[in-house]
């Protein structure tokens, strides 16, 4: 997406290598391997000249929680070697995974001690990097809808079969409209907004809305 391209430009402008991938797809792992070998071409050549061509390259996987670090390692290694799940905090400590050419160090996700930006805090909550049990799920879902419809209105409209008028409703009313369409009702015909909020967040994180970069 255009947002992803902006992130790539941002990192490359800072002279940092950047590859946009899916952690679940082998092609993404191969792209990272190629990027590592390109970055370390001089070192690998010196190793080869010194008779150390068989030495493995050590790679550390670090980042915020629940972004697919362990999933990526399993794809990179070609088998389920690191424990992975769709929630933050699964990786409790350092774990090494060895492949033919690489030794991969899987690290627990880390966050800032304090968020100076509400946008950063919201985006981390949207993708599940902050534990849901400390969040108000309805507020989370409303903020998510409001954010995504601003940059990806067509994806939200297509997923929940919304017309332009409904898509433009205030966030709470929009969530109610989606819940009504999905039949998430309680006795008396009112929308179960908590169930609807959970459904919205779960579907977003499962990529059922489509490819989205925040």
Residue ranges and their predicted role:
Residues 1, 28, 80, 112-115:
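Conserved protein kinase catalytic core
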Residues 1-63, 182-185:
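Canonical P-loop GTPase G-domain recognition
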Residues 8-9, 77, 121:
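Short, solvent-exposed amphipathic alpha-helical segments in soluble enzyme
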Residues 16-17, 85-214:
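Helix-rich effector regions associated with P-loop NTPase G domains
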Residues 31, 35, 71, 143, ...:
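Alpha-helical scaffold segments in soluble metabolic enzymes
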Residues 52-54, 76, 97:
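Solvent-exposed alpha-helices and their adjacent loops that cap or buttress functional pockets
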Residues 58-78, 82, 107:
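Glycine-rich phosphate-binding P-loop
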């Amino acid at each position: 997406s255009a947002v992803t391209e902006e992130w790539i430009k941002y990192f490359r402008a800072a002279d940092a290598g950047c590859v946009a991938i899916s952690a679940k797809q082998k092609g993404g792992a191969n792209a990272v391997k190629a990027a590592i070998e390109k970055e370390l071409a001089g070192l690998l050549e010196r190793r080869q000249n010194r008779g150390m061509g068989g030495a493995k390259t050590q790679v550390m996987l670090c980042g915020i929680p629940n972004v697919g670090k362990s999933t990526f390692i399993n794809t990179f290694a070609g088998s389920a070697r690191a424990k992975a799940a769709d929630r933050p905090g699964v990786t409790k400590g350092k774990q090494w995974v060895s492949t033919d050419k690489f030794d991969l160090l899987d690290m627990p996700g880390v966050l800032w001690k304090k968020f100076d930006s509400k946008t950063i805090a919201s985006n981390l909550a949207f993708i599940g990097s902050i534990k849901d049990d400390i969040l108000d799920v309805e507020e989370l879902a409303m903020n998510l809808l409001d954010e995504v419809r601003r940059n990806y209105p067509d994806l939200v409209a297509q997923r929940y079969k919304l017309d332009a008028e409904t898509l433009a409703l205030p966030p709470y009313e929009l969530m109610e409209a989606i819940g009504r369409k999905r039949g998430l009702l309680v006795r008396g015909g009112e929308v179960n907004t908590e169930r609807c909020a959970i459904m919205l967040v779960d579907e977003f994180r499962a990529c059922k809305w489509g490819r989205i970069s925040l």
